[in-house]
A protein has these predicted regions:
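Charged, amphipathic alpha-helical coiled-coil/dimerization segments
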Residues: 81-141
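Short aromatic/hydrophobic contact patches that present stacked aromatics
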Residues: 15, 68, 102
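Alpha-helical linker/hinge and terminal dimerization helices associated
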Residues: 21, 25, 32, 69, ...
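N-terminal helix-turn-helix DNA-binding core of bacterial DNA-binding proteins
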Residues: 23-75, 80, 155-161
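A structural signal for long alpha-helical coiled-coils and helix-turn connectors
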Residues: 50-53, 84, 90, 128, ...
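C-terminal regulatory/oligomerization modules of transcriptional regulators
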Residues: 1-6, 56-57, 133-161
Length: 161
């Protein structure tokens, strides 16, 4: 007779819980940002590129961008396809190494990001209203702490994108 599986341990799985809330959050933010033709992942890519170029960088190497976003490069490339097709990002030459593929945000991408920010803010406010501001703040702190610990402290705790 086969030994039964104790599912009580599975119900406490941190990964499954995180994936469940991630799906719910993604649906909420995608619903808001979809009104301007973006997903939350695409919004994050545009925001990170915008931040880098405001900081003086003309472009960001794709590998570095994937690291900053906590994404695998193949996942990032999948998210980049529609952004490229819409002319929101463009391929660039890395100034320090011409062999490195890099990206820049276009003027059209900056305009779309500006248009998207109020929709993102609305989704953020709905989340804070549903959870309560204190719980939302504690959740963000816990998530920042988990990212830092799991990456060995490599990522800044205040770098949400």
């Amino acid at each position: 007779m086969a030994k039964s599986i104790d599912l009580r341990a599975v119900s406490g799985c941190t990964c499954l819980r995180a994936r469940r809330i991630a799906r719910q959050l993604t649906q909420a933010y995608d619903g808001a940002l979809g009104l301007v033709g973006l997903t939350v992942n695409q919004f994050g890519v545009l925001a990170k590129l915008y931040g880098a170029t405001r900081g003086g960088q003309a472009s960001v190497p794709i590998g570095a961008l994937a690291d900053r976003l906590g994404m695998h490069p193949t996942t990032l490339n999948r998210d980049l396809k529609p952004l490229r097709a819409q002319g929101l990002v463009a391929d660039a030459i890395d100034a320090s190494d011409r062999r490195v593929r890099a990206l820049t945000i276009t003027d059209k991408g900056r305009a779309r990001l500006r248009k998207a920010v109020p929709f993102w803010r609305a989704a953020q406010k709905r989340l804070e209203a549903a959870l309560g501001a204190h719980v939302a703040r504690r959740l963000n702190e816990a998530l920042d702490h988990a990212v830092a610990r799991l990456q060995g402290g490599a990522q800044s705790r205040r770098d949400p994108l």
